[in-house]
């Protein structure tokens, strides 16, 4: 008698539409679903996948990161594409001329990009400008930059773990002695 195969892990969950009720986001999703199907380009498939992602996975992107990407050799006249919010960066002294296609651009970032002679286009305008993703640079924000991510990983207290413990206080008596110094039992 055979053993039934366990199908517990067979299903891979993929979003078929954005979770958001935003009608503009849903229309963009439909547009890029069409483009991904008809062009067969990987660029459009990636845009579609990211349009359907949760906000938590579409982290904001600073103007400084955009500037760094544009200043790389060969990227001067390319359009920077990001499926998130572009935010201003006060540490950036001068903004180069940038062409950006993004879901949202903050007021400060928008003013600085336009003042530098750059352009900001929407993703439906990008679909008309480069339907196959030609002359574009893809960027995304750091997904693991959230404070909550610091608590994920090997358990705090095990050797070589840099995981942040959940503690009620950061005082002397709280996860500071035992296991942290040789004079108190052991040191990991």
UniProtKB/Swiss-Prot annotation:
Name any one GO molecular function: structural constituent of ribosome
> Main subcellular localization, coarse class?
cytoplasm
Q: Which keywords accompany this UniProt record?
A: Cytoplasm, Ribonucleoprotein, Ribosomal protein
Q: Where is the composition biased (Basic residues)?
A: 161-171, 178-188
* One cellular component (GO) term of this entry: cytosolic large ribosomal subunit
Keyword Cytoplasm in the entry? The reply is yes
User: Might you name a Gene Ontology BP term for this protein?
Assistant: translation
Q: Does the keyword Hydrolase apply?
A: no
Instruction: Tell me the SUPFAM superfamilies matching this sequence.
Output: Ribosomal proteins L15p and L18e
InterPro entries with a match to the protein in the record? Ribosomal_eL18 (IPR000039), Ribosomal_uL15/eL18 (IPR021131), Ribosomal_uL15/eL18_sf (IPR036227)
**Pfam name, any one:** Ribosomal_L18
**Organism superkingdom:** Eukaryota
Chain residue ranges for the region called Disordered:
147-188
The entry's protein name is Large ribosomal subunit protein eL18
**What is the species of this protein?**
Caenorhabditis elegans
């Amino acid at each position: 008698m055979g053993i039934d195969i366990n199908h517990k892990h067979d299903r891979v969950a993929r979003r078929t539409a954005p979770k958001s009720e935003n009608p503009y986001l849903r229309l963009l999703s439909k547009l890029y679903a069409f483009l991904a199907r008809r062009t067969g380009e990987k660029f459009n498939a990636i845009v579609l996948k990211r349009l359907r992602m949760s906000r938590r996975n579409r982290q904001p992107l600073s103007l400084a990161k955009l500037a760094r990407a544009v200043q790389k050799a060969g990227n001067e006249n390319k359009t920077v594409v990001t499926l998130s919010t572009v935010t201003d960066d006060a540490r950036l002294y001068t903004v180069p001329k940038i062409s950006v296609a993004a879901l949202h651009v903050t007021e400060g970032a928008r003013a600085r990009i336009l003042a530098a002679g750059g352009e900001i286009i929407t993703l439906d305008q990008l679909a008309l400008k480069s339907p196959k993703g030609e002359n574009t640079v893809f960027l995304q924000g750091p997904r693991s930059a959230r404070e909550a991510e610091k608590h994920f990983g090997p358990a705090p207290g095990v050797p070589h773990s840099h995981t942040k413990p959940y503690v009620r206080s950061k005082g002397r008596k709280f996860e500071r002695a035992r296991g942290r110094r040789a004079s108190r039992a052991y040191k990991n």
